Regions:
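His/Asp/Glu-rich mid-to-C-terminal helical/loop segments that flank catalytic regions of hydrolases
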Residues: 341, 348, 352, 462, ...
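Extracellular/luminal Protease-associated
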Residues: 103-227, 233, 306, 328-331, ...
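Acidic/histidine-rich catalytic neighborhood of metal-dependent amide-processing enzymes
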Residues: 173, 177-179, 203-204, 317-416, ...
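Metal-dependent peptidase/peptidase-like ectodomains
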Residues: 105, 118, 144, 223-257, ...
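Bacterial Sec-dependent signal peptides at the C-terminal "C-region" and cleavage site
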Residues: 14-23
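Soluble metallo-hydrolase cores and metallopeptidase-like ectodomains found primarily
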Residues: 92-96, 109-145, 227-332, 348, ...
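Noncatalytic luminal/extracellular "stalk/propeptide" segments of secretory-pathway proteins
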Residues: 41-167, 273, 290, 415
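Protein/peptide-recognition domains central to ubiquitin and immune signaling
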Residues: 30-106, 185, 198-216, 221, ...
């Protein structure tokens, strides 16, 4: 009996040690240092640095004897690049007597996702459509009792729950997918609209007008879709709140009154009297391609069922005009050499472990251009997405050291959080809910491409409640990164980084993955989640 107990505890010790030996901080340091070095030139897709990055990840997967998803570890992602020629393009609003030219950058930002050198809109009627949301699970339909085909829709950003801070309405102050600008353009296209102008307001958008101006002006990279964007609306854009109020006034409408009315599910869309939009959009177009890097560890029993571990490999590249200490390389050490290093270490860990289900390791491209690599994988999947059990995403993990918590972005989404809690309880850690749910970060990283297809996903970070220093010190580190380092040349690797917390995060993830990979569990979205019906439809 004594011998048996000794053997049992020895086995437990070996298992524990094996985890810590395989999830090695020194390997994380090595990968992050290499991927964020000047040699990789900021990892911009379509550049020499981008090629180096893809090949580095590919060779790592290959060295572990992981299988390619198809014939190669590199999965092509076709891209289009369009620049609106503002000297030849315009948007104006006219009524029976006046033509109002909207000033690009100052009053309006506009573009098209239809890959055409030029397109025009002539006298399209303006309609105020409230929030532009169709959400059956909330009994909400802003498009009821109105035909918007060929019309220009003017709408509010975010969703009604944010404005009222009512937890019973959508998700209260927490943004839902229905509040995201990308959803609003998608829904308008499904409804047959010709153009959309979203009214910008800083608080519900969670960023100032300057962000809109810089993000949607100049070069716009998108997927080169097979239909060349023919299913998108002709014109997508934003207008300032002041511009919106001016247009409502010209139409004889009270903007603030209608904004309040739009908070009610009985709201009925309002035609903006005689106001019509005309536009001409002229594009300079080019095409390129990048690649996702994918590898599979085949399962023994259910090889066609998958657990996903993912991160985006791209960053912002080089900006020759930058003069900060003559540093023009955006190295992206935290964003997102950390995440890539994480999935490379998880691949290393699982390469020698047999599982019943297959494991999919995916490093996606063009996240910084709008989550394009993950979107392409999800839209043209090389595997059956209905057999994708769950996904784990790593994006910009702070080297903050050991913490008592794990932050779950988009907290309250799926049963993956229950599994995470069970694992954290075993080691005396806890889940910290998303501290800023109103900013909608859950919808701003690559896992959302899979959530939109119904796949439960977990987007977690290593936490801020430091074992040494507590939440105050952790938040200081996080805020310093956000304010001084995020998307700056200063996002560089340091050998002094404390990656012990990240290593613990990866160990916890490995245990969650192991549980799902050796069972027939199918985690579900929580009731009321906007992706729940999609998942249930796929399973049926």
């Amino acid at each position: 009996m004594k011998t048996t107990l000794t053997s049992f505890f020895t086995l437990l010790l070996l298992l524990s040690c094996s985890e810590n030996l395989i999830i090695k901080e020194e390997n994380l340091h090595k990968h992050i240092k290499i991927l964020s070095s000047d040699e990789f030139e900021g990892r911009e897709p379509g550049t020499k640095g981008g090629e180096k990055t893809k090949n580095y990840i590919k060779e790592h997967f290959k060295s572990l004897n992981l299988s390619p998803v198809s014939n190669d570890y590199l999965l092509e992602v076709p891209l289009s690049k369009m620049v609106v020629d503002l000297d030849k393009s315009y948007v104006n609003i006219n009524d029976k007597t006046n033509i109002i030219d909207l000033l690009p950058g100052k009053e309006v930002v506009f573009w098209t996702k239809q890959v055409k050198e030029s397109l025009e809109i002539h006298s399209s009627d303006l309609i105020f459509i409230g929030y532009g949301i169709v959400a059956p699970e909330y009994g909400w339909n802003d498009y009821k009792n109105i035909d918007v085909k060929g019309k220009t829709l003017v709408m509010l950003v975010n969703d009604p729950g944010f404005e009222l801070k009512d937890p019973k309405l959508f998700k209260g102050k927490a943004m839902t997918y229905y509040g995201r600008w990308v959803y609003k353009f998608e829904e308008a296209a499904r409804q047959g609209a010709e153009a959309v102008l979203i009214i910008h307001e800083t608080e519900p958008a969670s960023y100032p007008w300057q962000v809109v101006e810089t993000s949607w002006s100049g070069k716009q990279i998108d997927l080169k879709r097979k239909n060349m964007g023919a299913d998108r609306i002709k014109l997508e854009g934003w207008i300032t709140s002041m511009t919106a109020q001016k247009l409502f006034s010209i139409a004889g409408l009270d903007f603030n009154k209608l904004k309040k009315q739009a908070l009610n599910k009985d709201f009925q869309a309002v035609p903006m009297t005689d106001l019509k939009l005309s536009a001409s959009v002229n594009n300079i177009i080019s095409f390129s391609k990048s690649h996702n890097v994918a590898a599979i560890k085949k399962g023994r029993v259910y090889p066609d069922e998958y657990i996903l571990m993912m991160a985006h490999w791209d960053h912002l590249g080089k900006r020759e005009e930058h003069t900060e200490k003559n540093d023009h390389i955006y190295n992206g050490a935290i964003d997102n050499a950390t995440g890539v290093a994480g999935i490379m270490e998880l691949a290393n860990y699982f390469s020698n472990i047999k599982t019943d289900r297959s494991l999919l390791f995916l490093a996606v491209t063009a996240e910084e251009s709008g989550l394009l690599g993950s979107q392409y994988f999800a839209e043209y999947p090389p595997i059956d997405l209905s057999k994708l059990v769950a996904g784990y995403n790593f994006d910009a993990v702070l080297p903050i050291g050991k913490t008592k918590d794990i932050i779950v972005v988009g907290y309250g989404a799926s049963e993956l959080e229950d599994i995470l809690k069970e694992e954290l309880d075993k080691i005396g850690k806890y889940i910290m809910p998303d501290p800023t749910p109103e900013k909608g970060f859950f919808y701003r990283s690559d896992h959302i491409s899979f959530a939109k297809k119904g796949v439960p996903v977990l987007y977690a970070d290593s936490g801020v409640d430091k074992v040494s220093g507590g939440i105050k010190v952790g938040l200081e580190i996080a805020n310093k990164y956000t304010n001084l380092t995020y998307h700056q040349p200063s996002d560089e690797y340091s050998p002094n980084w404390d990656l012990s917390g990240f290593a613990e995060h990866l160990i916890t993830t490995s245990r969650m993955v192991s549980r799902l990979a050796n069972s027939q569990e199918w985690p579900k979205w929580y009731d009321g989640n906007e992706f729940k019906e999609i998942r249930e439809g796929n399973k049926n």
